Amino acid sequence: MQQCTGPLQLPLNNCGVMALDFNSMDGVATSIGHSPLTSLINSGSGSRNSIGEALTNIIWSPLKNELSSISLSANWMWPANNEGENSRLYEAVKACSDFCIDLGINVPTGKDSLSMKQKYPKKEVIAPCFWFMENFTIQ
């Protein structure tokens, strides 16, 4: 999950930028952060690391109003309603909320995939939890 560039879609970019028009210096910047391995160990740390990576990636774009010009989209893929997973999801969302409040960043949007489980006749397989942050700023 990286911003890619060129005809071969090489994952070399930290952020994606787009001009709003041809006549001004205004535009939009986006970046992505994820930390699936950290989320396996500690879901709260995984969500904070995802935010940290997204912010580190977008820092290469000028921000008119510093961090307050950034908005996040929180996306989580989680095997909810399985033993222990609802509390881990709550921990991740709470950590995200607290961290963003401390930084002065809003999270106006997001999406979830909470049915991350595959059922077979004699077995069930749950997917590992995954927290994915996308941030964007309009300059």
State each model region's role.
Residues 1-139:
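Glycine/proline-enriched, intrinsically flexible loops and inter-domain linkers
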